[in-house]
């Protein structure tokens, strides 16, 4: 409805959107299978298909082997790679909290993406959007769009693959075993079902689906530039899963196709493809907000994304020993002296790097409050950094505010924005917040706060005006100390919050929300507090980062957000 109303496009564009949507559906189906079998959202789903897809394309393009041989070799490699990934990596986290396993899939995606980039070197080549053509000669024009045999292959092969997997799950013994493992893994194991072997098979099938998606995409659009799955495709696949509540296969597949049509319609009506990702992100947020909240066994149960746990504190008897207290304060003093002495032997370039590192650690600390304490999974922390950067630069450059006031103002703006993003978390469970926050960072950094679209955003050089009207901090040496002081203040503030009632309440909610409510704790208020605190510190860091960089830089914000999540 959104596409037809606001982004009308001719039939050829709609058909092209169906093609892209079917490719997205293959990715989403693989993610759904893995989630149903192991209750983990696999962020490495696209990368599972890259290595075999690159192998198949290189065999066809560089070695000049027939198209069918490349397909068979790639499909075989994808089955082996999917099974190996589960056996060598995922199985090691079988008993770990799902949050840890989610981080493991993010790390697996990085490794597989790197290997996909390295593989073409065997042919003295590189991943450069190579295309492969189906050995059929068919071209027809549908309005202004020219479709070929590669599009026809997707329209035929993708529905057959989707129907085949659906039949496998519904009418075969393997499908029954997969569904039993997904519903009650412990009971399935007690009935003699090899749960871990079933998961290996599921990962192998998911790897094959990922390969077919990338192989078909190579015929239509070519291999992804840089050897990595585009975040737009990943976001659409995640959105389809969330709309289908990680459970209803027809809804997931229909949503994938609908989002593909919408994306192509937006691109047809707009000059920049970045607008398409922003519109998709907005539609995702609205779709998740209007869904009615209800309990579903397909969703993540309470506490499934609980962190590993905190390091136990020393017993009171040991902590009170004078030797340990002296050791603790001595270690703090030694670290402080080292940090203060370090800039004297660092060059300008390294000083700026360490200054930036201090500010990034501030963002990581803000994420610890939200995910580590409150148990809310967020992938969009860098969006609040961007908001803080814009507000901080506007306050100092246009209104002449002091850096301290600008940083506090940016923090308040980030807290308000974080509350707005956190509202879905009060109605929706599990991974919905992760997808909402990922959609939010895509919308903010690709369009809403992109200087290419809005001239009111900071465009030129951001000057470092004197601090408190008299302290010059324009040098890299002074910038280092400003960032260090900001990091120390953040540590002290967050430590105080952790030791206060607010921190204890957040930990209690993360561990057992039902029991915490029995002690008259308001979970809504506590979660919103965590969002506000997290957004405040992230935006404060953003205000300092824009002055450190002396320009508004939001490139690669999505990967940075995911990297911050892994670090946190």
Q: Where are the regions that the model predicts?
A:
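Interfacial "coupling" helices/loops that link adjacent transmembrane helices in transporter permeases
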Residues: 173-199, 510-514, 521-525
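Short, hydrophobic transmembrane alpha-helix segments
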Residues: 2-14, 32-41, 57-69, 268, ...
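Membrane-cytosol interface at the C-terminal ends of specific transmembrane alpha-helices
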Residues: 160-182, 199, 203, 215, ...
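Hydrophobic alpha-helical segments within and immediately flanking transmembrane helices
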Residues: 23-31, 41-62, 77, 81, ...
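Alpha-helical transmembrane segments of polytopic integral membrane proteins
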Residues: 28-37, 56, 81-87, 108, ...
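Helix-capping/transition residues at the boundaries of transmembrane alpha-helices
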Residues: 35-38, 60, 90, 94, ...
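Hydrophobic core segments of alpha-helical transmembrane domains in multi-pass membrane transport
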Residues: 1, 56-57, 75-81, 108-117, ...
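Transmembrane alpha-helices and adjacent helix-loop boundaries
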Residues: 8, 46, 99-128, 149, ...
